[in-house]
A protein has these predicted regions:
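N-terminal pre-domains immediately preceding structured catalytic cores
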Residues: 2-218
Length: 218
C-alpha cells in the first residue's frame, strides 16, 4: 500500500510528568453477540498469553484529540480510544508492513462484523496461495471486526481489524495493517461509529508516554 502524503498535526504531547497511571480495564463478554460466542468458543488457533503492557488499559491521556478519536502509535504498538476527562482506552496491537506505510488522518468509512477477506495479488504472490475469498470466521486473518479507513470517499486500504494470530500482539510483523485481539477489536468496535476520526502517527515519532508503567488490576 503506498504511503499517503498526509501530514499529521502533532498538537499536544503524550509526554507526562511523573508516572503514567494505568488501570487494567475489566474484560467482559457482555458485548459479545450469539455469533461471537459461537465462533470464539473454539478458535482454530492456540490461545495466546498477552503481556500485561499490551492488555487493555484505561490510561491518562495528555494530547488534544477530542473524545471519540482513535489514535494509533505504530512504534509503541498501541491504539488509543480517547475518552472524556483526560483518559483513553489503550489497546496493544500488532503492526504489519502495510500499517507502517500509512500515516495521517482518516475517518472510519465502513465497519464490518466477521468480514470476508479478499487477498490482494501481492499477498497471493508473497504468502499464497489463498482462496480468492476467505469467509468471515475465526480462521480469517481479519478476525471478528474490521474498521475500513477512508479519506473523503477514497478507501485508504488501511484497516484496523482482529486477528487469528493473537500471539503477535505487541510485535511488528511482515504483513497486515493494525491487528488487535478479537475481544479488543469487538470492544473498540462497540465504541466507534462511521465517521470516527483516526490519527495514525508516523514511524519514528517522539510522542510517546514517558515514565515507568504503573497501575492496578480491577
Amino acid at each position: 500500500m503506498p504511503r499517503l502524503g498526509v501530514a499529521v498535526s502533532l498538537v499536544g504531547s503524550l509526554l507526562l510528568g511523573g508516572c503514567m497511571q494505568a488501570t487494567l480495564a475489566p474484560s467482559s463478554n457482555a458485548n459479545l453477540t450469539p455469533r461471537d460466542r459461537q465462533l470464539l468458543a473454539h478458535p482454530p488457533y492456540a490461545q495466546a498469553t498477552i503481556a500485561e503492557q499490551y492488555q487493555r488499559h484505561v490510561v491518562d491521556y495528555a494530547r488534544r484529540e477530542q473524545p471519540g478519536t482513535i489514535l494509533v502509535d505504530t512504534d509503541a504498538r498501541y491504539l488509543y480510544y480517547v475518552l472524556p476527562g483526560g483518559k483513553a482506552i489503550r489497546y496493544g496491537v500488532a503492526v504489519g508492513e502495510e500499517a507502517m506505510a500509512f500515516s495521517g488522518v482518516a475517518t472510519v468509512g465502513r465497519m464490518a462484523e466477521w468480514p470476508d477477506w479478499i487477498p490482494t495479488r501481492e499477498i497471493q504472490e508473497r504468502l499464497g496461495p489463498y482462496p480468492s475469498r476467505v469467509a468471515g470466521g475465526p480462521a480469517n486473518p481479519l478476525g471478528a471486526r474490521a474498521l475500513y479507513l477512508y479519506q473523503g470517499s477514497k478507501d485508504t486500504l488501511f484497516r484496523i481489524h482482529g486477528t487469528n494470530q493473537p500471539e503477535y500482539i505487541g510485535q511488528a510483523i511482515s504483513s497486515g495493517c493494525i491487528r488487535m485481539t478479537n475481544n479488543d477489536v469487538i470492544d473498540l468496535f462497540d465504541h466507534v461509529k462511521t465517521g470516527t476520526t483516526v490519527v495514525v502517527l508516523p514511524p519514528g515519532n517522539q510522542s510517546t508516554f514517558a515514565g515507568p508503567f504503573t497501575g492496578r488490576r480491577i
